[in-house]
Amino acid sequence: MKRIMLFLVTNLAVMLVLGVVLNILFSVLGINKSSISGLLVFCAVFGFGGSFISLLMSKWMAKRSYGVQVIEQPRNETEHWLVSTVARQAREAGIKMPEVGIYDSPEMNAFATGARRDDSLVAVSSGLLYSMSRDEAEAVLAHEVSHVANGDMVTLTLIQGVVNTFVMFFARIVAGVISNFFSSNNDEESSSTGGFAYMITVFVLEMLFGVLASIIVMWFSRQREFRADAGAAKLAGRDKMIAALQRLSRGAEPQLEGSMMAFGINGKRSMSELFMSHPPIEQRIAALRG
């Protein structure tokens, strides 16, 4: 329930902010809202705006959605090891020390998030800390630090923004063509019905184009995972990273959602690899082994 409320409130706030930004842009640039240029600006504002606002709020959302307890002062040996390990890896990767946190979950997983390389969060599940060896956990942390060092959060946000923009744009263009084709007259009843049909068509096309576009986003995500694995192998050692992946392959399916899933150590399985945010573990191990 808490996650649902956060989702609804956040999306409402995003819509309000983007609506204000859109009106300002139309006024300043003098763009006709009903023109193709106006439609493209509308789609770009909501396509990129939603992605970037989500990125800016990602740390805040992650902490509240998953109940991440940021370690301000280590209280035990495990927390001390966790903080010191991330600090060492961040130094070697050339980034500022991320915030480090733990969230309560029996699954073995971790994620990184944050709007900038020097303003990030690395969070691990309690299940990972208690189920993995120190060497395996070190490799997982190195994987997340590599995501931060590689700037993966911003990269995928840009890709998602481009995809969102064109999904919205082409859905409305195609819906307009279909609506014009089937409209027979311009009386009030037809206009009202046509407007409703247009909105339904836009919704259906956005769903369809969104599914197709997600293939592109997921492909980029899988490439970033291979790169993060390679970075982890440099920071923690190839054998440790392979051992961590082998341990993950024997664990339960992860429960992270949305952008947290994209930057977790392990992703959900899918009927098709095209829609997976992470490559199959056997492929990741094979890539590390060369």
Curated annotation (Swiss-Prot):
CDD domains: M48B_HtpX_like (cd07335). Binds 1 zinc ion per subunit. GO terms for biological process: proteolysis. It holds the Pfam family Peptidase_M48. It is found in: Cell inner membrane. The chain crosses the membrane at residues 6-26, 36-56, 158-178, 200-220. Its main location: membrane. HAMAP family: Pept_M48_protease_HtpX (MF_00188). This is Protease HtpX.
